[in-house]
């Protein structure tokens, strides 16, 4: 009696957690840089190099990559003109501070896979003394513990003497786990209205309006690479240049069904901006390189035939059931959240003359369950580079955090629903209303996927059942009154006959019965 089964590859989420990690480091300014007087601008990102899991202990190793613009304490005699920047005394530091952090993710074991996503929620660079800076911030960490396993589903028994109750089950089959680095490179030329580049001072690079589509054997990732470049001209003036270039990349993955379901998460891995000569030999081109760490999955939604129950009228056998988790898709929902906020800089003594560019990121603060979905609360962080009214240092950066809240509809959620949410910036526009008041308009994309992980009883094997003496003495013909919740299959199995036999004896045209129906049953 052979049990015919089908193996279905699944990824079961076991546990998830969101936490924040604070860091506080001292940074000693290198000898080739002059003394610091005041920090003007700062920005940074988290670079995750290694994830080590040992049971419930998760070790994260990486670095905080940061950029700082600061004013010199004084202008040194003998400096080259380009180092004095026309008396503006602006200097640039770009470096990284390594970190290692231990987190605990309860419920995972050695065989599980741990996914980690990080973001830099806050960065503050202060002056300790003329040769030392304090770098402080908060890193947000998303942790997911999951396990790949094969669900073995019994589909039939290769024996004509066995009665089989068939059914259908919707499952989400894992076709491919995607993990890759997407590299982006653009070369842009300065507008004719902009002067030539003498020296790059700072660069803010981020990705916006990222979208992906699954097309049989690959995922197409499209979006916009946004860069704000601050440079020194040949006339020793500080200039700003903002550019936005479209990008498109293909990520290879398994699967050949155009209707497959894809889920993708991206994280910035690096960026680099270099000045290059154009065809005329002038320094008017910018090479912008960026890399995104891509992590995701591709599923196919299938309806499979399953063997729900079985028995034999000729020999005493019984199925052995085991509870297993079955993953299915509840909903995938993409929502846009529009943001409009007016802000006023009360404590600033410098008048804003022009907003040069921005760097943005969106982060989740909290996810709450609602009646028919979830409420996602988060923060849109906008770093603005401004030209201000200050002959000594005409450039500054300020960071604004604009809260947002959006309801995402996911009907049918319960305790067995696993929901993952990703937020990213689509558009941001900062308009200067007057010299101290400005307006932030933005669109944040909120992507949510909800998977149902229900525990289902499935047949894993068939074993021989002992024959009792009472069975041999039972009457060959019995009368039966249908009880509440009785089904024809259960009645036939109890009296070791077949559904077809009961229907034939009682002249029934359907196998449906209702309470208090009277049946004649002939044992086989």
Features from the language model and the residues they span:
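Primarily a LysM-type cell-wall glycan-binding module
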Residues: 467-504, 509-524
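Interfacial loop/beta elements and low-complexity acidic/Ser/Thr-rich segments
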Residues: 1-473
């Amino acid at each position: 009696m052979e049990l015919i089964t089908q193996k279905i590859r699944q990824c079961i989420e076991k546990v998830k957690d969101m936490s924040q990690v604070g860091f506080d480091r001292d940074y000693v300014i290198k000898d080739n840089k002059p003394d610091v007087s005041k920090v003007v601008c700062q920005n940074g990102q988290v670079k995750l190099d290694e994830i080590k899991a040992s049971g419930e202990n998760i070790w994260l190793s990486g670095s905080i990559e940061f950029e700082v613009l600061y004013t010199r304490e004084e202008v040194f005699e003998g400096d080259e003109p380009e180092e004095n920047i026309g008396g503006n005394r602006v200097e640039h530091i770009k470096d990284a501070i390594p970190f290692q952090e231990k987190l605990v993710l309860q419920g995972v074991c050695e065989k599980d896979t741990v996914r980690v996503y990080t973001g830099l929620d806050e960065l503050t660079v202060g002056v300790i003394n003329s040769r030392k800076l304090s770098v402080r911030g908060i890193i947000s960490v998303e942790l997911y513990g999951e396990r790949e396993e094969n669900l073995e589903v019994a589909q039939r028994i290769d024996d004509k003497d066995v009665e089989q109750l068939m059914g259908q089950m919707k499952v989400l089959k894992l076709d491919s786990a995607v993990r890759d680095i997407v590299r982006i490179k653009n070369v842009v030329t300065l507008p004719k209205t902009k002067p030539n580049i003498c020296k790059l001072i700072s660069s803010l690079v981020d990705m916006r309006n990222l979208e992906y589509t699954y097309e049989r054997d690959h995922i197409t990732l499209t979006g916009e690479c946004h860069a704000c470049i601050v440079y020194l001209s040949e006339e020793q003036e500080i200039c700003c240049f903002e550019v936005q270039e479209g990008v498109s990349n293909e990520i290879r993955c398994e699967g050949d069904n155009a209707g497959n379901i894809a889920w993708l998460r991206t994280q910035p891995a690096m960026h680099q901006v270099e000045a290059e000569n154009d065809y005329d030999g002038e320094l008017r081109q910018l090479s912008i390189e960026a890399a995104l760490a891509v992590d995701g999955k591709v599923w196919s939604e299938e309806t499979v035939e399953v063997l729900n129950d079985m028995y034999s009228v000729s020999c005493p056998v019984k199925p052995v059931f085991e509870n297993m988790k079955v993953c299915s898709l509840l909903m995938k929902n993409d929502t846009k959240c529009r943001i409009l906020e007016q802000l006023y800089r009360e404590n600033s003594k410098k008048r804003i003359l022009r907003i040069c560019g921005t760097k943005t990121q969106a982060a989740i603060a909290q996810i709450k369950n609602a009646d028919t979905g979830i409420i996602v609360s988060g923060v849109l962080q906008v770093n603005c580079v401004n030209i201000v009214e200050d002959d000594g240092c005409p450039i500054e950066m300020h960071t604004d955090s604009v809260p947002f809240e959006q309801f995402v509809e996911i009907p049918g959620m319960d305790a067995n629903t696993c929901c993952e949410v990703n937020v990213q910036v689509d558009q941001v526009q900062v308009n200067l209303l007057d010299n101290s008041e400005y307006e932030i308009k933005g669109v944040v994309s909120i992507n949510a996927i909800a998977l149902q992980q229900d525990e289902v009883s499935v047949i894993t094997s068939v074993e021989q059942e002992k024959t009792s003496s009472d069975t041999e003495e039972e009457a060959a013909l019995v009368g039966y009154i249908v009880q509440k919740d009785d089904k024809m299959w259960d009645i036939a199995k109890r009296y070791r006959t077949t559904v077809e036999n009961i229907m034939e004896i009682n002249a029934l045209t359907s196998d449906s019965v209702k309470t208090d129906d009277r049946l004649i049953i002939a044992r086989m």
